[in-house]
């Protein structure tokens, strides 16, 4: 399955890789689940790259339209629940 990922040409190669890993973690939460701390760690790195809330929303929206997932709901669940494993 071909997935389109929202990336910026302003990001370094390392930043692109880290953003891809974040979006893969979102997918993993929907597929087989992911360790809560792993997901939140990838989100923290994502926020270092994309500190702007409006840019985050744009990237989430672009990704969600292509992949039928909710980045916001996934992160919200990881923050609110104390379970070690997040499954959407």
UniProtKB/Swiss-Prot annotation:
Specify the domain of life of the species encoding this protein: Bacteria
The record ties this protein, via InterPro entries, to:
BH2638-like_sf, UPF0223
Give start-end of the signal peptide: none
Q: Which residues cross the membrane?
A: none
**UniProt-listed Gene3D superfamilies:** BH2638-like
- In which family does this protein belong, per the annotation? Belongs to the UPF0223 family.
Protein name according to UniProt: UPF0223 protein BH2638
